[in-house]
């Protein structure tokens, strides 16, 4: 069982590597019933950021929300990043507000990283690794470290 202290410590660990700001707008693509989705928003809540959630993942809707709300950050699994990158290449939207794309949950292919970076050149790609019993994040790799 995870304690509140575990979750807060994990959010603090995340924020020391990936600074959060009050004016951040996070698109939550990961399901909130999963550790990535629920714990992924704690740092954003802590810093008084705003979350926009998807009822179900759809790359077209995700990109429309990024454009409409000037989303600054998002998180998801590599297949989600691949899907939004391909949709952005096929039907570009204004996404220059997007400064951070966090991914984890499974390995990410080099080609997916490349396509995502070319689709969202203003966004830093950050990889997280963890497990639910770790509260959940234990390793964070920024652009520089990848």
Q: Can you name each region flagged by the protein language model?
A:
Residues 24, 30, 99:
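Nucleotide donor/acceptor-binding cores
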Residues 30, 36, 55, 105, ...:
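Residues at the C-termini of beta-strands that transition into short coil/loop
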Residues 8-25, 33-73, 87:
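Conserved AMP-binding/adenylation subdomain of ANL enzymes
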Residues 46, 71-76, 85-146:
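Gly/Ser/Thr-rich phosphate-binding loop
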């Amino acid at each position: 069982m995870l304690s509140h202290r575990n979750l807060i410590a994990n959010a603090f660990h995340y924020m020391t590597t990936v600074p959060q700001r009050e004016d951040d707008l996070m698109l939550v693509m990961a399901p909130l019933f999963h550790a990535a989705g629920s714990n992924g928003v704690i740092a954003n809540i802590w810093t008084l950021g705003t979350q926009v959630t998807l009822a179900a993942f759809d790359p077209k809707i995700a990109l429309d929300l990024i454009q409409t709300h000037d989303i600054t950050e998002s998180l998801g699994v590599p297949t989600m990043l691949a899907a939004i990158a391909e949709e952005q290449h096929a039907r570009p939207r204004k996404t220059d507000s997007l400064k951070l794309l966090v991914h984890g949950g499974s390995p990410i292919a080099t080609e997916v990283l490349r396509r995502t970076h070319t689709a969202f050149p203003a966004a830093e790609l950050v990889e997280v690794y963890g497990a639910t019993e770790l509260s959940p994040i234990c390793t964070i790799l920024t652009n520089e470290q990848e």
